[in-house]
């Protein structure tokens, strides 16, 4: 009869603890890039929609991640990964 392999990996922290730590990190980053009023209103909307549940926590994390990603792609002044806005010159020298 087959037996399940023993857990040989490192001890992992509980999912809930990890999720709350992730939320704190994302909130700290969001506060650096967005007005607090916007973030408060987003939090209120999530709370009104999901209440005080883990689904609400996950929705807030997902929304903040999407907002930060778009913010960085558009070209955050603090970021090195934003789209660089360059003007193209017609009939200019080609890159080869």
Curated annotation (Swiss-Prot):
User: What processes in GO biological process is this protein linked to?
Assistant: DNA-templated transcription; monoatomic ion transmembrane transport; protein homooligomerization; regulation of DNA-templated transcription; symbiont entry into host cell; symbiont-mediated activation of host apoptosis; symbiont-mediated arrest of host cell cycle during G2/M transition; viral penetration into host nucleus
Where Phosphoserine occurs along the chain?
A: 79, 94, 96
Q: Where in the cell is it found?
A: Virion; Host nucleus; Host extracellular space
Taken from the record, one Pfam family name reads VPR
Q: How is it modified after translation?
A: Phosphorylated on several residues by host. These phosphorylations regulate VPR activity for the nuclear import of the HIV-1 pre-integration complex.
Q: Which UniProt keywords apply?
A: Activator, AIDS, Apoptosis, Cell cycle, Host G2/M cell cycle arrest by virus, Host nucleus, Host-virus interaction, Ion channel, Ion transport, Modulation of host cell cycle by virus, Phosphoprotein, Transcription, Transcription regulation, Transport, Viral penetration into host nucleus, Virion, Virus entry into host cell
Mind telling me which Gene3D superfamilies this protein's record contains?
A: 6.10.210.10, VpR/VpX protein, C-terminal domain
Q: Name one GO cellular component term.
A: host cell
- Ranges for the region named Homooligomerization are 1-42
Outline what the protein does.
During virus replication, may deplete host UNG protein, and incude G2-M cell cycle arrest. Acts by targeting specific host proteins for degradation by the 26S proteasome, through association with the cellular CUL4A-DDB1 E3 ligase complex by direct interaction with host VPRPB/DCAF-1. Cell cycle arrest reportedly occurs within hours of infection and is not blocked by antiviral agents, suggesting that it is initiated by the VPR carried into the virion. Additionally, VPR induces apoptosis in a cell cycle dependent manner suggesting that these two effects are mechanistically linked. During virus entry, plays a role in the transport of the viral pre-integration (PIC) complex to the host nucleus. This function is crucial for viral infection of non-dividing macrophages. May act directly at the nuclear pore complex, by binding nucleoporins phenylalanine-glycine (FG)-repeat regions.
Please describe the quaternary structure of this protein.
Homooligomer, may form homodimer. Interacts with p6-gag region of the Pr55 Gag precursor protein through a (Leu-X-X)4 motif near the C-terminus of the P6gag protein. Interacts with host UNG. May interact with host RAD23A/HHR23A. Interacts with host VPRBP/DCAF1, leading to hijack the CUL4A-RBX1-DDB1-DCAF1/VPRBP complex, mediating ubiquitination of host proteins such as TERT and ZGPAT and arrest of the cell cycle in G2 phase.
Please report which protein family the annotation says this sequence is part of: Belongs to the HIV-1 VPR protein family.
**HAMAP family membership:** HIV_VPR
Share any extra remarks: HIV-1 lineages are divided in three main groups, M (for Major), O (for Outlier), and N (for New, or Non-M, Non-O). The vast majority of strains found worldwide belong to the group M. Group O seems to be endemic to and largely confined to Cameroon and neighboring countries in West Central Africa, where these viruses represent a small minority of HIV-1 strains. The group N is represented by a limited number of isolates from Cameroonian persons. The group M is further subdivided in 9 clades or subtypes (A to D, F to H, J and K).
Stated name of the protein: Protein Vpr
What is the protein's species of origin?
Human immunodeficiency virus type 1 group M subtype H (isolate 90CF056) (HIV-1)
Please name the taxonomic classification of the source.
Viruses, Riboviria, Pararnavirae, Artverviricota, Revtraviricetes
């Amino acid at each position: 009869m087959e037996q399940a392999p023993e857990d040989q990996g490192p001890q992992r922290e509980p999912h809930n603890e990890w999720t709350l730590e992730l939320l704190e990190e994302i909130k700290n980053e969001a506060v650096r890039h967005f007005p607090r009023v916007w973030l408060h209103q987003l939090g209120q909307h999530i709370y009104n929609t999901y209440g005080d549940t883990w689904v609400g926590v996950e929705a807030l994390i997902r929304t903040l991640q999407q907002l930060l990603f778009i913010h960085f792609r558009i070209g955050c002044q603090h970021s090195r990964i934003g789209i660089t806005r360059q003007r193209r010159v017609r009939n200019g020298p080609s890159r080869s």
